[in-house]
Amino acid sequence: MKKIAVYPGSFDPITNGHLDIIKRGLSMFDELIVLIAYNAAKSSLFTVQERIEMIQEALHDRKGVRVDSYDGLLVDYVRKEGGNVILRGLRAMSEFEYEFQLALMNRRLNRNIETVFLMTGYKWFYTSSTIIKEASRLGGSPKGLVPEVVFRKMQEKYPLMNKGK
């Protein structure tokens, strides 16, 4: 039986910290689905389609991974895809309490689905999509913190970023 994990997030944009979790997750599971969860409460920099394309390009050389989007209950998606694991990355202990609550709710909704937490690599500990977007908007460069495809797309969105190269 294939071990299928789903790694959900907004990925707006995907960062090298996310890629670290994906690459490590691929060593644990037969298939990893990077799931862009649609969140109407958040205003997004990139459309869902743009995010799918950037993630696919960033992971083009990886086998066993695919990218999808979903607007619904996560456990329903995992079950529909034949998965049994939700993969989550943690940067700090402060994130654990919230993630733990989500994991317990998902477990209550479907007892056959487990949540696996991976600590982000120390190199990416401080990296978040929100911080990267804010720094870029103000002229800072995210080079080295995001895949090259994301860097190029962010240059289009944030003209100030181009001045600081």
Swiss-Prot record:
Principal place of residence: cytoplasm
Binding-site positions, substrate: 10, 42, 74, 88
Annotated keywords: ATP-binding, Coenzyme A biosynthesis, Cytoplasm, Magnesium, Nucleotide-binding, Nucleotidyltransferase, Transferase
GO molecular function, one term: pantetheine-phosphate adenylyltransferase activity
GO biological process, one term: coenzyme A biosynthetic process
Transmembrane segments: none
Enzyme class: transferase
Pathway(s) it belongs to: Cofactor biosynthesis; coenzyme A biosynthesis; CoA from (R)-pantothenate: step 4/5
Ranges in coiled-coil conformation: none
Site (Transition state stabilizer): 18
Compartments where found: Cytoplasm
InterPro entries documented for this protein: Cyt_trans-like, PPAT, Rossmann-like_a/b/a_fold
Cofactor(s) in the UniProt record: Mg(2+)
Catalytic activity, reaction form: (R)-4'-phosphopantetheine + ATP + H(+) = 3'-dephospho-CoA + diphosphate
Residues that coordinate or bind ATP: 10-11, 18, 89-91, 99, 124-130
Function field: Reversibly transfers an adenylyl group from ATP to 4'-phosphopantetheine, yielding dephospho-CoA (dPCoA) and pyrophosphate.
Name listed for the protein in its UniProt record: Phosphopantetheine adenylyltransferase
